[in-house]
Regions:
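Flexible linker/loop signature enriched in Pro/Ser/Thr and Pro/Gly
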Residues: 84-87
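Conserved C-terminal alpha-helix-loop-beta "cap" of PLP-dependent enzymes
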Residues: 311-431
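Conserved PLP-enzyme active-site core in the AAT-like
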Residues: 2-26, 30, 37, 47-53, ...
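Short glycine-rich or small-residue beta-strand-to-loop segments that form or flank ligand, phosphate
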Residues: 60, 64-65, 91-94, 328-333
Length: 432
């Protein structure tokens, strides 16, 4: 079987040396992979329990249209999300188009003119800069008289508690905590660290809303931020919780008032959650959530595999190969434009869709420099499917994530290494 497998990898373009190096790394990671599988099993049981508690039935998959009144599948799914993630209520809709939309919705519905938004973990995603008004944009929070302040993490990645205390004012209404690193190389926040930060903030101002941007973090650990005091948790269905099956959508889970505010902003005052047809995608939302713990486990294995390989080749990787994992993203700093692009070409070449396409840097909306993206995905923009991207500027860091199966993630990493090896950008001869 091993010989047959190696021949199949060779057929896909993986050389004998690259394959041997990958097999060596995989053997070293067996114990860590077993721990990931154990966490996935726990989270799988959690999802099943939530579905059974809420009596999910075949009728939940019926298609609704028009206003979407009395959409049983939609309403049941939102109760499943609330129970699964530990919230009082949930908003899970195909009308929420992406993660940025979900975050903007949560912010704009729970802030009012004169309020202040605080980020105690530094700069948010580039795409949120225009939502907040850091970069001027139509309809931003700043246009509505909502101010913003941020406190950067310390150089070692720890919280600047003194700075945070001084940044909390009488009009600080909402604190946004970005769990994942985004296009940065700071540490991703564990649920435990998020809990300690929320406790600190609530001790200073108990009525402040603590919102966690949970993108890329769902099912990575055995609990979610709502379990440690968050009031609201936000994410995208074309990331972890959609399990690779949801074709669109986002969610907001948390305190009932926060979720209701978001629902009235998404639709209209007086309508809220009562309208919004599921339009035939609801079954994929259920099935994707059901598969999500297993899919996330494969993505985690791929991230650790990538970290171990590229760390051994001398590159800086964040997290490193031994650190605990709190999201599915793996950053690799290449310090070289050609190496970064070659990596992305390898990820694209391993895709089941558009494998023949060569990714090129381009001026992506929402970013201040060219971005390169590799994503031969079934769902456009899906970050739980095998993908890699990054801003093409120093330190030329590429952000790798996803893989609907561990085996596909493995192929992607080996293909990325193959591209670098063919161009003499790495030397693996002594490591095989």
């Amino acid at each position: 079987m091993n010989q047959l497998l190696e021949e199949k990898y060779k057929e896909l373009g993986i050389s004998e040396k690259v394959y041997a190096f990958g097999e060596k790394i995989e053997q070293e990671l067996k114990e860590r992979f077993e721990k990931i599988d154990a966490n996935a099993e726990y989270n799988q049981m959690k999802v099943i329990a939530a579905m059974q508690k809420n009596r999910v039935s075949a009728e939940c998959f019926n298609i609704s249209s028009g206003y979407g009144y009395n959409d049983m599948g939609r309403d049941t799914l939102e109760r499943v999300y609330a129970d699964c993630f530990g919230g009082e209520d949930a908003l899970v809709r195909p009308q929420i188009t992406c993660g940025t939309h979900a975050l903007a919705l949560a912010l704009m519905s729970n802030l009012r003119p004169g309020d202040e938004l605080l980020s105690p973990v530094g700069k948010p995603y580039d795409t949120l800069e225009e939502v907040i008004g850091i970069r001027p944009s139509k309809g931003s929070l700043a246009e509505y008289g909502i101010t913003y302040s941020q406190v950067d993490l310390r150089p070692d990645g720890s919280f600047d508690y003194d700075g945070i205390r001084n940044a909390i004012h009488e009009n600080t209404r909402l604190v946004t905590i970005q769990r994942s690193k985004g296009y940065q190389t700071r540490p991703t926040l564990s649920v435990e660290r998020i809990g300690k930060l929320i406790t600190f903030i609530k001790n200073i101002k108990p009525d402040v809303i603590c919102m966690v941007d949970n993108c890329y973090g769902e099912f990575v650990e055995d609990r979610e931020p709502l379990a440690v005091g968050a009031d609201m948790m936000v994410g995208s269905l074309i990331k972890n919780p959609g399990g690779g099956l949801a074709p669109i959508g986002g969610y907001i889970v948390g305190k009932k008032e926060c979720v209701e505010n978001a629902a009235y902003r998404l639709t209209s005052p007086g309508l809220g959650k009562e309208v919004g047809a599921s339009l035939g995608v609801i079954q994929s939302f259920y099935q994707g959530l059901f598969l999500a713990p297993t899919v996330v486990s494969g993505a985690l294995k791929g991230a650790i595999f990538a970290a171990d390989i590229y760390e051994k080749l001398g590159y800086k990787v964040v997290p490193d190969s031994t650190e605990s994992r709190h999201d599915i993203i793996q950053a690799v700093e290449f310090q070289n434009r050609d190496a970064m692009i070659a990596f992305c070409e390898g990820i694209q070449a391993a895709a089941p869709v558009d494998s023949y396409v060569t990714p090129e840097p381009w001026a992506m909306p929402g970013y201040d420099c060219d971005v390169i993206m590799a994503a031969g995905a079934f769902v456009q923009g899906s970050s739980i499917e095998l993908s890699a991207d990054g801003p093409v500027k120093p330190p030329y860091a590429v952000y790798f994530q996803g893989g609907l199966t561990w085996y596909h993630a493995k192929l992607g990493i080996l293909m990325s290494l193959q591209k670098l090896y063919e161009r003499n950008l790495v030397n693996i001869d002594e490591l095989c």
